[in-house]
């Protein structure tokens, strides 16, 4: 099986450009609609913030220097607003007022 490395890199960069819009201004990463617009009326979800932090860390390792800032943004949310500092673990989702559910990841 063969693949076109040029196409693969271009497609990866296209997907990363789409994902860059997911930065949530309150911390973490937002859900994106089909057009790539962040859905800021939805809470910041732990799984999305974890995934996007990982995606941008890989992008940074691939030489996309701009992605380092987004890794820092994600790690700050994971260590900050998504973390339950009183009992440990992470909240499944948070909005501007805090956790939207008592569901947590230990």
Regions flagged by a language model, labelled:
Residues 1-106:
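Glycan-recognition and catalytic cores of secretory/periplasmic carbohydrate-active enzymes
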């Amino acid at each position: 099986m063969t693949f076109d490395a040029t196409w693969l890199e271009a497609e990866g960069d296209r997907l990363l450009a789409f994902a860059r819009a997911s930065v949530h201004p309150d911390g973490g990463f937002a859900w994106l609609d089909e057009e790539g617009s962040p859905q800021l009326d939805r809470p910041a979800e732990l799984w999305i913030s974890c995934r996007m932090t990982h995606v941008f860390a890989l992008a940074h390792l691939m030489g996309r220097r701009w992605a380092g800032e987004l890794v820092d943004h994600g790690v700050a949310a994971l260590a900050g607003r998504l973390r339950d500092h009183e009992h440990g673990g992470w909240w499944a989702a948070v909005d501007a007022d805090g956790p939207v559910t008592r569901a947590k990841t230990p």
